[in-house]
């Protein structure tokens, strides 16, 4: 019986971690792309601010897509700007997920959005 209870708790635990907030309760402001260096040493900075407009503290996962001039996705990466820390209502955190990307000369456009929300 104890095993059944423990098993049920482990299965249901991830469900309890999702916040009552939705991805639309978060906004990304001042998103900027900057490349520094040259040749093989080019480093990307893909930075911005993640703002919590939800009524409760929560964290959000951000997805960035790097696209060529035709709109084809070359690379896509996801990250949690605040890590495992919840962002208080009305507060923001700065992020830079550029280190997750390997620079390609045909990267022309970038899209960014919130894809998941949870409480830690």
Residue ranges of each PLM-predicted region?
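Positively charged n-region of N-terminal signal peptides that target proteins for export
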Residues: 1-4
